[in-house]
């Protein structure tokens, strides 16, 4: 799989797709959606679709595709190579979301959580296939969150398509199994060949599974945290594991707004402004604009 586009710029998102088989432009097709790397604190999350004509679904099943988590890396790569050889009836596309994109989205002023990101990415890939004139008539999706809600959302967006969302869909439907293999092969390759934009001394590539509860991954995070700049962009700094290490190992920063929010005095209850007690005599704090410029209210001239 050629991920050179991602290797040139791994700070955002990258979409790749196979050529569309001619038969998929003419015959009704089934499409599967799955992801790899949703939970790890390291590396990208990859969403993939795989599609083929309904008339050739038995040929896809004959490849003996299975849930990627039950296969070894060599088995996944062998099956992906077979799907590439069968490009006359099998097509695919994938979206690679970088750790940097995931974290900045989750921690932005307007929060964009991982579930919403996942739903939108899956829908975007289905739309991508349709924009390429693939005759999609059935879609099978491995669920994120409540399957009923997710299915209703996709069905509303794609009213002309029969949508099925199930837990463990990657072990129930071969076309979803194929998508899971494609996603996992792409993520494994992306992680293995990750281009660090930071100049890191003594970079250790042995970071374990990348999952938050892996001791080797935690050790790697502690080793490569900078006390001022934090983690390299390979790390999803929005994950609680990374945040806990930052709080312990990095320099603390107090922002003015944070200090104001943590003020124990606070504004208090609204009824306190109408009381005659000592709190009613609390001096009013002027706006930050006036404090920064040393401006005070003049009571006399």
Curated annotation (Swiss-Prot):
One of its GO terms (biological process) is DNA replication, removal of RNA primer. This is Ribonuclease H2 subunit A. The modification Phosphothreonine is found at residue 217. Its main location: nucleus. The RNase H2 complex is a heterotrimer composed of the catalytic subunit RNASEH2A and the non-catalytic subunits RNASEH2B and RNASEH2C. Pfam families: RNase_HII. Manganese or magnesium. Binds 1 divalent metal ion per monomer in the absence of substrate. May bind a second metal ion after substrate binding. GO terms for cellular component: nucleus; ribonuclease H2 complex. Catalytic subunit of RNase HII, an endonuclease that specifically degrades the RNA of RNA:DNA hybrids. Participates in DNA replication, possibly by mediating the removal of lagging-strand Okazaki fragment RNA primers during DNA replication. Mediates the excision of single ribonucleotides from DNA:RNA duplexes. GO terms for molecular function: metal ion binding; RNA binding; RNA-DNA hybrid ribonuclease activity. Residues 28-251 form the RNase H type-2 domain. It is found in: Nucleus. It comes from Rattus norvegicus. The modification Phosphoserine is found at residue 258. Keywords: Acetylation, Endonuclease, Hydrolase, Metal-binding, Nuclease, Nucleus, Phosphoprotein. Disulfide bonds: none annotated.
């Amino acid at each position: 799989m050629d991920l050179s586009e991602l290797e040139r710029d791994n700070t955002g998102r990258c979409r790749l797709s196979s050529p569309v088989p001619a038969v998929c432009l003419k015959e009704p097709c089934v499409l599967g959606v799955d992801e790899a790397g949703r939970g790890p604190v390291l590396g990208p999350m990859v969403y993939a679709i795989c599609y083929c004509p309904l008339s050739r679904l038995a040929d896809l099943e004959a490849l003996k595709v299975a849930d990627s988590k039950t296969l070894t890396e060599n088995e996944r790569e062998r099956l992906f190579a077979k799907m590439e050889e069968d490009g006359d009836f099998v097509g695919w596309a994938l979206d690679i979301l970088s750790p940097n994109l995931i974290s900045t989205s989750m921690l932005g002023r307007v929060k964009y959580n991982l579930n919403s990101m996942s739903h939108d990415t899956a829908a975007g890939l289905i739309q991508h296939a349709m924009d390429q004139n693939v005759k999609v008539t059935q879609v099978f999706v491995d669920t994120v969150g409540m399957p009923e809600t997710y299915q209703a959302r996709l069905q509303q967006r794609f009213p002309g398509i029969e949508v099925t969302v199930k837990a463990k869909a990657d072990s129930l439907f071969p076309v979803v199994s194929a998508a899971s293999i494609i996603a996992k092969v792409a993520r494994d390759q992306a992680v293995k060949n990750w281009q660090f934009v930071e100049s890191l001394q003594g970079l250790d590539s042995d970071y374990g599974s990348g999952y938050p509860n892996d001791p080797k991954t935690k050790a790697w995070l502690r080793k490569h945290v900078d006390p001022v700049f934090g983690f390299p962009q390979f790390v999803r700094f929005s994950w609680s594991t990374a945040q806990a290490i930052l709080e312990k190992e990095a320099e603390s920063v107090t922002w003015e707004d944070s200090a104001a929010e943590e003020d124990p005095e606070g504004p208090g209850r609204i009824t306190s402004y109408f009381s005659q007690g000592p709190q009613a005599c609390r001096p009013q704090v002027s706006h930050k604009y006036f404090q920064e410029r040393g401006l005070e209210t003049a009571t006399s001239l």
